[in-house]
Each structure stands twice: as C-alpha cells, then as structure tokens.
Amino acid sequence: ECMGGAGYVEDSILPRLYREAPVNSTWEGSGNVQCLDVLRALSKEPGVLDVLFSELGDGHGDKRLAAHIQQLQAQFKDTSDIQYRARQLTEDIALGLQAKLLLEAGNSAVSDAFIASRLSGGGRVYGALPRGLDVEAIVARSTPQIL
C-alpha cells in the first residue's frame, strides 16, 4: 500500500517484488540452503564461533544487543537439535550482525529503531514501531533535500 496506492498501481517491478516477498524464503529452499551453509561452516571450522562472537563484541554499548548476544551464545551450549533450530539460529545471527553494523554506522535513530523492533520484541510489521523512537530523524534522513 505504501508503495502503490491500494496495491493496484504496477508501473514498476516493485509491486511484483513485494507480492513475491513472502515466498522468497521457501523458493528452491534458499532459506534452508543458507541454514545448511551456517551449519556446515560450524561443523567444518569450529573456530568460526569465536570469530562471530568477536565480531559481535559486547553489544557496542547497547544493553539490548548485549542481551541478544548472550542469548545467541546460549543457543550453542546444547547442539543436539541444532538442525531443528537452524532457521531461528541463522536469523538470530543475522539480526545481531545487522544491529552491530547499524550501531557502528553511527545513526542512533536508525539503530535504535532497528534494535527496538527486531531485538526487543517490538512490532515486526510495517508501521508498528514501539513508542519513543525518533522516527522524525529517520524520515528526515531518507527525505531528499531539494535546493
């Protein structure tokens, strides 16, 4: 709706991409292939976990990311059902790395909104951000400056 009226304007490829987005994780097993790649890397190179957690650091001063990293570390204590949990594990790794990169990028409005909505149990659907975020700064950042 936000990219084409009531969802019927199709002057570009964008509506098709949005329409197909829900099935992207199942087409040709791409989501599962990514999970298998993560599991394969973990089994072939056990040191990859040390590299991952070294990269994530201590949360870069954000308590929510630090808690996510601790929860992620706990997921590796019992690996008896790791194949069953592979999708959740892969998602948690990706979310942690995304949050870390956003914090490093230095735009606190964007990183705060991402972490609040992805790591802190905030709304995950479009337009459902938790209260108290600097959404004006996010909008201003993405609004073109016209001379």
What are these regions (language model features)?
Residues 1-147:
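Flavin-dependent oxidoreductase catalytic core characteristic
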